[in-house]
Amino acid sequence: MKREVYLDYAATTPLRKEVYEAMKPFLKEKFGNPSSIHHFGRETRTAIEEAREKIAKAIGAKSDEIIFTSGGTESNNMAIKGVAFALSTKGKHIITSKVEHHAVLEPCHFLEKLGFEITYLPVDREGFVDPDDLKKALRKDTILISIMHANNEIGTIEPIQELSKIAKEYDIYFHTDAVQTVGHIPVNVDELGVDLLSISAHKFYGPKGVGALYIRKGTKIHPLIHGGSQENNKRAGTENVAGIIGMGKAIELAILEMDKEIERLTELRDYFIREVEKRISDVYLNGPRSNRLPNNINFSFAYVEGESILLHLDLEGVEVSTGSACSSSSLEPSHVLSAINVPIELAHGSIRFTLGLYTTKEDLNYTLDVLERIIEKLRTISPYKQEWKINKKS
């Protein structure tokens, strides 16, 4: 019997009922502008500051180090461009990695057009940045290092503590895109040793269109948006009050349930990986088996196109992704899989399954059954099998 199974939690998560209830008053009755000094304004200002405190507490920061944004993309842009513009007289060299989200890579490409030099660090076959490669890439004019906390496609959790120590030795700012980790695994800015950290609410059952950037006190950064004095003069514009309230409630719930969810999702993840590898031949796990996000699974299925698998799964009620949801409409192979040296034929056959709060073992068993049938069907009609074998030999 067909059932609906959502396995694309890395792309976005459903809004929790408790979060919606917390937001509702600020969508209608509590409508005051937080910059107004009358009662309606003070009411929303107080609520925003309470939410800011929740976000700060969740990552071990101070509340005045949290700047609310429109989401992870803006937070990444603000961190990278903001530091670049603030320190351009000191240096114009930035270091990042080849497996970053496009919300980091594209700001770097933009800065290259303005005369900045960007070093894109390689990664190993599991997606890890080598600290020695970072050391070798350092220059006297390096002003920023930006390495993601965990990869959105293959789940690799990077050794941020080790990498940030290198940055500190040379007095270089360190930014991490923690969009996939905040609310899912423990994140503490002091333990990580970072100066800037990006967050997105809709990745942990909060609303879309709201996020935050942690900026360590004393970090020099220029605002991207100019206007009013909101967000400590760092991000102008009337705040998204309901969104911020929802984000605060979502992170509060995520932290309360984190330990239990890590254990549950890790068990489900490992079960799914074992079953896929047992039932289906010529399948390859992309990314590491340990030091991996508890909800992330990425497989390459030989001889078939990932898009065909995705569409057939969709017809069976199973929702998955072929990579980052922000660029999965592209026909180009994933830049992440290319960076870990996955052959192009296998990269085109990749599917990402990401689990979440409402994923059950029954969901996974249903998915396994339909996936097995789909792969078998697609391989019987695939024109790629012989071609792939020829390319593999050459």
Swiss-Prot record:
It is found in: Cytoplasm. The modification N6-(pyridoxal phosphate)lysine is found at K203. The active site is at C326. Keywords: 2Fe-2S, Cytoplasm, Iron, Iron-sulfur, Metal-binding, Pyridoxal phosphate, Transferase. It comes from the Bacteria. InterPro entries: Aminotrans_V_dom, Aminotrans_V_PyrdxlP_BS, Cys_deSase_IscS, Cys_deSase_NifS_bac/arc, Cysteine_dSase, PyrdxlP-dep_Trfase, PyrdxlP-dep_Trfase_major, PyrdxlP-dep_Trfase_small. GO terms for cellular component: L-cysteine desulfurase complex. [2Fe-2S] cluster binds at C326. Pathway: Cofactor biosynthesis; iron-sulfur cluster biosynthesis. It catalyses: (sulfur carrier)-H + L-cysteine = (sulfur carrier)-SH + L-alanine. GO terms for molecular function: 2 iron, 2 sulfur cluster binding; cysteine desulfurase activity; metal ion binding; pyridoxal phosphate binding. Its main location: cytoplasm. One of its GO terms (biological process) is [2Fe-2S] cluster assembly. SUPFAM superfamilies: PLP-dependent transferases. Its EC number is 2.8.1.7. Its cofactor is pyridoxal 5'-phosphate. Pyridoxal 5'-phosphate binds at G72, T73, N152, Q180, S200, A201, H202, T238. Homodimer. Forms a heterotetramer with IscU, interacts with other sulfur acceptors. Master enzyme that delivers sulfur to a number of partners involved in Fe-S cluster assembly, tRNA modification or cofactor biosynthesis. Catalyzes the removal of elemental sulfur atoms from cysteine to produce alanine. Functions as a sulfur delivery protein for Fe-S cluster synthesis onto IscU, an Fe-S scaffold assembly protein, as well as other S acceptor proteins. Belongs to the class-V pyridoxal-phosphate-dependent aminotransferase family. NifS/IscS subfamily. This is Cysteine desulfurase IscS. It comes from Dictyoglomus turgidum (strain DSM 6724 / Z-1310). The gene is iscS.
